Amino acid sequence: MKNIPVVPAPWLTCLLLASLSLAAQTISVDASHPTNHFVPKETLGAGVDRIAVEAIDKDLLQPTLDKTLASGWQPVTYRQNTELAIEAWHWNPQGTWSDKSDRSDANGKGYFTGSAEPTEMIRYSYGYALPRRGTTRNDGTDNVGFSRLTDGDVNTFWKSNPYLTQHFTGESDALHPQWVVIDLAQVQQIDSIRIAWEEPYARRYVVQYWTGEDPIKAVTRGVWQTFSQGTVLDGKGHTETIRLSGAPTAVRFVRIWMTESSNTCVDSLKAVDSQRAVDSHNKDARDCIGYAIRELYLGTTTPDGAFHDILRHTADQEQTTTYSSSVDPWHEPSNLGSIKQAQMGFDLFFTSGVTRGLPAMMPVAMLYDTPENAAAEIAYLKKRGYPISYIEMGEEADGQYMLPEDYAALYLQWATAIHRVDPSLRLGGPSFQGVNKDIEVWPDANGKVSWTVRFIDYLKQHGRMNDLAFFSFEHYPFDPCRTPWGMLYDEPELVRHITQVWHDDGVPPDMPMFITEGNLSSGASETYQDIFAGLWLADYIGSFLNSGGKGVYFFHFL
């Protein structure tokens, strides 16, 4: 197909202004100096996400599908949704569990790897809620589930991701600190903490409080201050009660920052729950690395030595809120979530006609998965002969509060595994949430706060920039129900600005850049199919391509 030059101006806005003004307007088009070239069959696409099972079947009926395709969107990106809900993705319901002590795959547990061998048609796929979760809620959980850190049950626990330990990264654990944050909802007086450790526990850690308003949403408006007695250099595990300061301190947010693990395993004969009761001769190394906490308690110690806990311990969203750096993707069959919604099965996706037969951008789960499962997924797709354009690695790591060095460490492990299947595959990410400004995180040792700067730095320091074939992010510029017509004038600068931000952060100017989800608002996207949205859409796409973008994907197709 003939390459089409992009008009080097926000032309639709100019037309709108012309229609609103009595004064004559002149639009100059110089086709001899295009700012970009694009091929519509590669550039103008749409996304398919997790939806109701009933909707999947209805939307793929020929009359409905024909109307969908008539919209004109060309390539499709398959969106990865289970990561937003802190779930492990069984992209293939057939597969094997790492722990087969129950003598059958169906009754196994541990780490699941989908079968790479095509057999029965995969029509739907589902997520499994992770039982070692440490986050009460994030931007994708929809207030479903809860943290095991304040659930009131000492037989459950949070555990960090084993793939972020030296065993897999090849780097000191101090370079990938793991953390949990407690949000007290309001400022309260604190001088003591009690930590009920599981194994492995932290040998070295510090307990800190935040000096600003919100360390999750305003990461540069405050600092983490270590309590005067909050440094532990030789932790012993079990249940530790620590007097953090001589006098109570007024705080709202408290963080435990862990830098050295005991790297110890639970004695299977002493295990108090089924998660850890495994045959000691078949012990999985992943169960013995990282950090694990059964329950957290925070409050004050009175002069008589009594500890008074102020946290709310419930197995629901009313618990004291906690956040965690990562989650161990260990799970078992009983953790299957709701089956009313599903990711479309790969075989249904590629044979239904929704892709038009064009190569599709496919995802792999990464934040809550294993590299073996990701590699098996790609092997399956290749054995089926399904065309793949790009592979997007993980979903919205920024919305999961993951530090860039942790994402990068996982990225390289997954890239290695996938490229063993096919070295020619083009991988990318990080599929940021739709934002209009640079994504910032707590400063590193050098004071750097830009997520993208630190991600790119990590790849360069490890000599692996070649594993990043494209850069992806989402674009949802406006809040729902608050989009006056005047905001149409803002869009060209919004998308131009954020594109320039990524380049300023170190994304190479010649690296393909994709907006892999885009609409007016993430909160109410389907309601905007009107004139306002049409005008915005044309301006948004034109401005992004004018800024050098490679492709956009409307969210969403079905």
Features from the language model and the residues they span:
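Disordered, acidic Ser/Thr/Pro-rich linker "stalks" and the adjacent N-terminal cap
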Residues: G95-Q186, E198-Y201, R221-G222, Q229, ...
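N-terminal module-boundary/linker segments of secreted carbohydrate-active enzymes
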Residues: Q25-K58, A408-Y411, A415-A417, G428, ...
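Noncatalytic carbohydrate-binding groove/subsite architecture in carbohydrate-active enzymes
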Residues: P371, A376-E377, P404-S543, S547
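N-terminal signal peptide c-region/cleavage motif recognized by signal peptidases
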Residues: A18-S21
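Trp- and acidic/polar-enriched beta-sheet ligand-binding modules for extracellular glycan
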Residues: L175-H176, E199-T300
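Extracellular and analogous surface-interaction loops
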Residues: W179-Q189, L244-T249
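N-terminal substrate-binding region of glycoside hydrolase catalytic domains
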Residues: D30-Y128, Y297-F346, V354-D369, N373-A376, ...
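Loop/turn elements at helix/coil->beta-strand transitions in domains of secreted/extracellular proteins
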Residues: P40-L44, G72-Y78, A250-R252, T355-A360, ...
